[in-house]
């Protein structure tokens, strides 16, 4: 006679072992998530478009907006390398560029010119050759270039004529090279006539301050509203040439807008449009 089932044996109970499996499942999911996050962290998101920004102090103010716009798509990784005093004719630029290119960017976003104006205006042809040399070095590392023009300047600075000469050089560079694309920053930061403005309609559809105020006077540097508009301009250009989807909603209101650079000098981005 076969022994009967021991009803006191847990293994003999209906569904025995299922609860143990159900207990392990969440742990497996968590472990896989950790492995995936470690992979992304160590590879830096190898499938994302590698972008670097370079330029002067105006570009420095624009960098957080460019980074926010591009990274909000999940398809780009942005290294921001702009700082005050950068120019093609300034000491140390070649070493600065080599260091940036050593990281293998696929796209280089450039915005500069203010520190080059004296030499540029004095000898535009020589500056054009310098532009070609710099573009050759970027292309030689496999990068394409988005060259942003100098934004409209406050009339008080008295550099508008020189700015036009500089932007003419950047336009000409893009015209003779397939690996360089020129972007008109006046479209993003200018008023209705493309000239300087302190305020304009921002990405949220309301009027925002786009340029700083310094000592009560208009200044050429950017506020978060201007940086966001610049980021949107760059994103639009990249999406024309790369498979990049839509950014997350209202990325222009994220934490980057509280960066300390937008309160330098204090209150510079707190002007009222009234």
What would you call each of these model-derived segments?
Residues 47-129, 256-273:
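Conserved SGNH/GDSL esterase-like catalytic core that processes O-acyl groups on lipids
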Residues 140-144:
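A short helix->loop->beta-strand "cap" motif at the edges of active sites that frequently abuts
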Residues 124-133, 162-167:
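Charged helix-capping and loop-helix junction motifs
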